[in-house]
Amino acid sequence: MTKWFDTNYHYIVPEWHADTQFSAHPERIIAQIREAQAQGYAVKPTLVGPLTLLWLGKKKEDFGCRIKTLMPKLLPVYQQLLQAIADAGVEYVQIDEPILAADAGKPWLEAFPSTYQALAQAPVRIILGTYFASVAEHAALLNSLPISGVHIDCVRAPEQLATFVAQLDSSKILSAGVVDGRNVWRANLRQVVANLQAAKAKFGDKLWVAPSCSLLHSPQDLALEEKLDPEIKSWMAFAAQKLVELGNIKQALQNGLDSVQAALEASDAAVADRASNSKIHNAAVQTRIANLPKGADQRGAPFAERIKAQQAQLHLPLLPTAALRSAFESRPAAT
């Protein structure tokens, strides 16, 4: 297991061999699509992209470039999966390629055009999703791909919004991730709406508002929390509340700020209170920090000297500690 990029969520790392074979098993996702459709939702499924899937895997053997060896076998399976999703009545599919925000390397970037040319043959409209960091340097690449739109993380990298407003063709969809999918705090709705005005002017109805990333990183529903301090609770938004925030942002963009005045006022009050509340802002601590002498945040000796002194005193083995966090939790907390 390893962490999903820089989050605290983990995934089982697949191991790739030169003779690895892939096959499509769409039954589970099709069942989930049908369930959502039965409740009246227009479904936009999300898949991990083929380039990210191969990049994140563990190469078990030295068989050369994963792109050249495995991608020709993987792409037909993605095409089958997309066809099955299209047959279920889905118009849009989001395919996430977060490696664009990582240092994937030139061969992986060069593989995007051919990969998405192949995926574009499926009868669905593809939104290519990115998150956790800026992909502004790849705006031209993304604009050139045969896709219907791009999702960007405007929470972790708000500065990239201007780049995509300038460089993304207005015929494409810009999905702006403006509500933080990774924390528990309410968004500053008024500020978000203001930040989106230029994008709204260019893209019109092709501007989508979205969480910055999957909401699986947030708790489900704040309404289920009955023991939180009411004041602190008023600053929070879990996944269910973040969806409401997105609805308010959409309405404000379409119909003006007056159409969501009550929501804006509640957001303003929560943001202002959290910014100054004494429960989380300790004036005494702030004063102590401000009065720290110069160099108080620096070590007295470099690491090379400290490690020698530590070893001379403690005689530690190579791996002195190794523990999982769950080992320190009680069973009720762990379960």
Residue positions per predicted region:
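Domain-level signal for soluble alpha/beta catalytic cores
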Residues: 1-335
